[in-house]
């Protein structure tokens, strides 16, 4: 084991890694840098030894935790706050081209800005194909952890991402 070269960027932290069919690795990172606030991405073609500089993706990110997973179907799924400011909206996005574009988006939960916070999401695909998401939720002074169970068809039913 040895550490890789750093992923250079403006405010990139907390990576979530995905591996393409060709073996290249994509690091998806929360954005704590200057606007525009987008999920940042960097790529490695040598198993993580070296990385491209972090660049903005099309997905908004207010500097909050996010997770990207590769599903057994080959589709990629992202869960995180889908706004540039605040954590009052949480969504899942789905890509059918290994993260090049994110054609489908479905909101899991939202509140008025300043009236709720949804953070620290996590996602897994169960053996039966169902997707399970958890996140921390704070509304009206109460904090809890929520869980949602859904499938890829539910995400697609929202239609193409505007």
Annotate each language-model stretch with its function:
Residues 1-162:
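Asp-box/BNR beta-propeller blade signature and adjacent active/binding-site loops
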